[in-house]
Amino acid sequence: MKLTDHQQKMLDGAFGKGKAMAMQIQIGVGKCFDAERLVPVSRAHVSLSAQEADIWFAGKLLDAGASCAIAPTVNPGYSVDYFRSRLTDAAVENMRKTERIYRGLGARLTYCCTPYLADNVPSYGEIIAFSETNATLYANAVLGARTNRESAASALCAAVTGYAPEYGMLLQENRFADVAVRVDAKMESDFDYAVLGLCGKKIGKGIPAFLGLPEKISTEALIALGAELNVSGSYDLYHIPNVTAEAAHGFDLFGGKAPKREVTITQSDLEQTLEAFSPSADGSIEYCILGCPHYTYAQIEEVERLLGGEKAKADIHILTSAAIKRAAKESGLEDRLLDLGADLIADTCVDEACCWGYLAGKPGVTDSPKGAYYMETAGIRMAVRDTATCIHWAKQGRVC
């Protein structure tokens, strides 16, 4: 790879062993993808997990004297304050150690998986290094920024060095759609877009352009679409005419070429996809988990509306950012929800078995296929339904 004088000095250790280590990793990643050079990045987001490999790697950089050239935002681990009675002493120390390491590196401890909404919002064409698959897709597609689907390690190394290898989504020629996806279905709710995202098996590999969708799509629907595309497949970018950033800037979606494939997604496809992912449920419902990805304020308000003043018989857990939880507290929304059996949990991911293990074997429901996928890896099975159905079942404490 062609390195600048500054990059070569960093690799040679002129700025410390930690930065040299991070630079060596970035060069290695670049060589894997035939990148010719490293380019500056202005933002980073690290999919911190507070799990062993994450702590080991970040700790190794810190011990070598690394610090971040760009202060990255970070994904959630788990709230020790909320879950303290359910956590072992080892789990508490695990999260505390994560905090110490990332604070030492100079990260912004936002603990949120939707940084693009408030804490870390890139502009059109900005070169960044985001891990967290829903964040990568939202940044690339909806905002028109440029990031590869970074790992937690490579995003952290980008934050430490200030550089990322130039390949993939950083290059214009790789950002054209090559799969035309005609959507012939009723797209009436945010949840419909989540299920559309689950159709990755039929969409197949590539960059999809979704055709036939409404020109007004909510932020929450676009978040859901991106999150679930990377449950059912591996996607860096998608386009929607007159909705996503490049498609709204006169961008030639297919780069003057015919698409490699044309796919139609019907209403039947959506129904069959959901049924295959989450078979029919019956019996009691003991809990409902919402907020994977983290809920927006508008989504939390919708939960209150759906509850309609009726206290839920099943526990409702809503995961969100600390900033939104704080806003809900200040507005009185959090207290009203608590009275109705719904609690807001900040700084927490569903993919943390130490928090949620007590739910194993208990029947629950969620509006997030991604959340259900994560939970199942910990032996926790949840039905997946739209938000209105989730709240209706939670109010009754049973499938109805």
PLM features: what roles do these ranges have?
Residues 1-400:
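Non-transmembrane, aqueous-exposed alpha-helical and coiled segments at domain scale
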